[in-house]
């Protein structure tokens, strides 16, 4: 509260009036000459009541996965493994047998990631797994014996690239870590040619038969009151120059993310690392970029806006570095992020009319430490896990495949007769940011 001094004379009143008038004129000049201070009414509303307030989630937090607020349709689309991962259901008992998993033809291309985690030694892919009754092989000669064949769509050249033999009870699972925009590495394919081939899907979405997201949010079994986040230390250790970092090596994208960054930089400082920027730092899968830990915010901008497509850019470059992620990607964006990330742990570009309005909100947070600290309250209730295998983090791909063989229904034969209905750019992706419409 501001208290006014006691005024004893008319002279003091005049002096106070002059001072207030001068301050008003100076403030007006600043607001009209510095574009970073040209606060719009819409931005002001955003600042007063920011979306995704943590308080809105307190009463709905529980330990059974309902905090995601999945729709009945979404819940029905989950496999048994999906219900374990996303609804926190107890898994069934492991089956009393050993399964052989063949990674067809291109297993070696991801060996360093899933079997070494980009380290200098082999790791057991089932070391952290709830089940261990599986064997993984790259030997294509095992195609006739394998219980499951994993087929990497990204590397597949055409439909003739499939195994030549197949047992009736064998499960073929198509696998991809890319969005539908970049499903195939070798140009466009006729998706209809693959109809009727695959029994299971293996990708990052919740509705996959074998969900393999880049990371996951897990509700803690009990509220963590003992280890609160040291916000004061965090604030002290962050960069006092540029508050935001971004890193990119793929300089092309269909969602115009780099155009958005260019516009954002007109209103707030952003340090740009990687081949698309001017600053150098390792950090492309194999080597980490420790410099990112010096920033308050990280632009976790994906290369396409597709359903649930949230990569290591967010899980590792932001959350693992204790930076607040500013997100662009998943579509429909607000629902995707709200169901997959801790509440009030991120800032969504779709909540702002333009990069300028986003910048104003970030300036506001930088000047309001109490509001900035609210973006870390989720840590008492949730934890985030990196599960992608980059930067020597655990890879759960083969573990999830083994869990699916143990948990999912093996008695009912499932077949994807319409692959495009499950996986297509037209159905599962959205248009990117438009500079004309977005500002």
What are the residue ranges of the model-derived segments?
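Pol beta-like nucleotidyltransferase catalytic core
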Residues: 5-150, 155-174, 185, 189-315, ...
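Catalytic toxin/effector domains delivered as secreted proteins or via bacterial secretion systems
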Residues: 178-181
